[in-house]
Amino acid sequence: MTKGTDKNSNQMLVAHLSMFGACVGWGLMAPIGKEAMLHGVSGLSMVTFRVVGACLLFWLASLFARKEHVSRRDKLMFAGAAVFGLLLNQCCYTLGLSFTSPINASIVTTSMPIFAMLLSALILKEPITGKKALGVLMGCSGALMLILTSAAHVSDKVGDIRGDLLCLFAQFSFALYLSLFNPLIRRYNVFTINRYMFTWATIMLLPFTFGETMATVSSHLSMKTWMEVAYVVGIGTFLCYILTMVGQRALRPTVVSVYNYVQPIVSVFASLLMGVGVLKPTHALAVILVFTGVWLVNKSRARGDAK
């Protein structure tokens, strides 16, 4: 094995571990963030805490990172990336969750890798191979099996088509971000990328949510709730976006998106560890389907292989 091949293998391993780590953080963020929203933090306030808090953390981290020159054109491109990768994705999902049931919202999130596969074919000319399509289908089946069997004994409110459509658009928005801005993401380090994206998102979001967020801040939340918000901002946003960018720089958009199916696994196992869930045989089958799906998508042909 040559040094170049060995280095590339190490980069791919780091990329996959980073995506898995991000999905673990996001999977744990779901129950923790939901708990905070049940105790005084509104959905839009939570989005604002995430965006503004992560913006401040990325500016602070940038003081210790390598300085990079960013062209004026790319600065404007980061504004577009912030719209599709942050604002539309987070705001639509949060608003959708307020209309529909958590189960419906979880089911809708399984559409994102399908959108990513189709958009990558249209925009990046990535081939849709049988192996890739089978991998996405297997991952989707595993995630749906996990969500539906876990929800079988949960009393949940009826879904709402408005909320379902908003959650669906959130997935489409993030898939579009993965395909449109993939070349931009590969040009800069993770701190430069996130600093500009979260700065643009803060500028665009804060004028509309400042009043509601300040009302939340002054509402005497408990220390436990503030700790939950801190997790959502520090781990679920700051750290997870760093890990996602590391993965996105080395992996194809469809591979990045199919890791979305790992999040329900993390949520279920977190509930088992917390003693609020019961392990079922279908959980093991779902895990096998998801990780087999990720493996198949990763092994499918890339654009360069198709030439």
Task: Give the residues covered by each predicted segment.
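Glycine-/small-residue-enriched transmembrane alpha-helix faces in small-molecule transporters
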Residues: T2-F49, D156-P183, I203, P207, ...
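Juxtamembrane helix-entry segments on the extracytoplasmic side of multipass membrane proteins
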Residues: Q11-H16, G40-L44, T48, V70-L76, ...
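Transmembrane alpha-helical core positions of polytopic small-molecule transporters
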Residues: C23-G27, A81-Q90, P113, I147, ...
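Specific transmembrane alpha-helical segments of multi-pass solute transporters/efflux pumps
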Residues: G25-A30, W59-T109, M145, V233-L251
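Transmembrane alpha-helices of multi-pass small-molecule transport proteins
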Residues: G33, L38-L88, F115, S173-L180, ...
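Helix-helix packing/entry segments at the starts of transmembrane helices
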Residues: M46-F49, Q90, N104-S111, L180-T202, ...
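Hydrophobic transmembrane alpha-helices of multi-pass small-molecule transport proteins
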Residues: F58, A79, L119, I128-S150, ...
